[in-house]
């Protein structure tokens, strides 16, 4: 181990920990690769992935972030750390390990589907060892792991709203015990397959109902169909339909959704507006390759809203009218 980067910030908007990857995305394929042949992609994107998607997306929405993640002493790790530092993510609680390889994912989207290939070893230290005492923060965001418990409870006790998600279970066993750390969490943000798998239900709505018994804010993302949520702290329930965009790459879209929801929750918006905003940020990220690096900032959100206001889609203008009050303030903050 070669240590940490810089002096820790005393307080941030959002603290994050989990597994970081270097994502490499090939786009513009007309069909999936066929063994024994070579095909050329029309587009290429790369950048930090995994938990880093959340950090970059939050920074672009104007929130300060601190990330505790392991990086190898290798080119993928150095590239990830460089990009994260350039966008303003605090890496003082991240560590660089000499004898560990930074995970790498290659994403190959093509019409109607995509394929992912990942290389990586288990993290060299536990989340609790990596985090130690989490910094003061308004929110904390975690990829749930068996060793997440202690630091999550410390963050919650210190006043942070803890937002959690899970990764895909390649065994598809979906062991419910893996959700035990949700007792210390404010929100849980699985996709529909994950939610139904862990709750042993057959519809996203049924899964949401079960998850609402476990956390104050339960959210299920449903891909192109949008998202549904229940907030037990306010008694609100809401759904938000997906938005029609020209999809280039879906890598990291769920993470960008989580960042949008976190930012909107910290802003104190009603649940329906939080959900719509998260769907919007996720949808805008689909238009470019590269996961984290495709996450929108306020200028891109403002450009989308300007275009919508000049259409005859009255339902869309009504649903997103709240942006009229939000965008001028946020863009002013950026300057």
Task: Label each PLM-derived region with a short phrase.
Residues 32-42, 88-90, 234-245:
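Glycine/charged-rich beta-loop-alpha catalytic/anionic-binding loops adjacent to active sites
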Residues 1-15, 204-335:
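Conserved phosphate-binding/catalytic region of the ribokinase-like
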Residues 14, 64-65, 91, 162, ...:
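Hydrophobic anchor at the start of a short beta-strand
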Residues 83-100:
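A glycine-rich helix N-cap at a beta->alpha junction
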Residues 156-161, 167-239:
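Conserved phosphate/ATP/ADP-binding segment of small-molecule kinases
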Residues 96, 105-146:
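Conserved phosphate-binding/catalytic loop of the ribokinase/pfkB sugar-kinase fold
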Residues 1-70, 75-78, 316-335:
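Glycine-rich phosphate/adenosyl-contacting loop at the front of the ribokinase-like
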Residues 9, 134-136, 182-183, 212:
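A short, aliphatic-rich alpha-helical micro-motif
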């Amino acid at each position: 181990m070669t240590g940490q980067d810089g002096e820790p910030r005393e307080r941030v908007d959002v603290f994050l920990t989990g597994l970081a990857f270097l994502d490499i995305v090939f786009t513009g394929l007309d069909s999936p690769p066929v063994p024994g042949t070579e095909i050329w992609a029309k587009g290429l994107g790369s950048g930090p992935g995994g938990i880093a998607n959340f950090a970059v997306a939050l920074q672009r929405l104007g929130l300060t972030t601190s990330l505790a993640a392991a990086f190898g002493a290798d080119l993928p790790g150095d590239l990830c750390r460089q990009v994260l530092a350039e966008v303003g993510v605090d890496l003082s609680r991240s560590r660089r390990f000499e004898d560990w390889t930074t995970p790498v994912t290659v994403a190959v989207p093509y019409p109607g589907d995509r394929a992912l290939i990942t290389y990586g070893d288990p993290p060299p230290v536990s989340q609790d060892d990596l985090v130690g005492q989490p910094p003061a923060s308004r929110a904390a965001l975690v990829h749930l792991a068996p060793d997440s418990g202690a630091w999550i409870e410390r963050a919650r006790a210190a006043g942070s709203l803890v937002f959690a998600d899970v990764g895909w279970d390649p065994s598809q066993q979906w062991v419910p015990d893996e959700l035990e750390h949700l007792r210390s969490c404010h929100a849980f943000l699985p996709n529909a397959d994950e939610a139904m798998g862990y709750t042993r239900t057959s519809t996203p709505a049924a899964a949401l109902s079960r998850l609402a018994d476990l956390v104050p804010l339960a959210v299920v993302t449903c891909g192109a169909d949008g998202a549904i949520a229940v907030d037990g702290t306010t008694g609100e329930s809401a759904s938000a339909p997906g938005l029609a965009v020209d999809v280039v790459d879906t890598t990291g879209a769920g993470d960008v959704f989580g960042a949008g929801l976190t930012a909107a929750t910290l802003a104190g918006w009603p649940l329906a507006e939080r959900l719509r905003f998260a769907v919007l940020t996720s949808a805008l990220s689909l238009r470019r390759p590269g996961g984290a690096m495709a996450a929108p900032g306020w200028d891109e959100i403002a450009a989308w809203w300007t275009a919508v206001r000049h259409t005859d889609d009255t339902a869309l203008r009504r649903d997103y009218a709240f942006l009229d009050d939000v965008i001028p303030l946020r863009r002013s903050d950026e300057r």
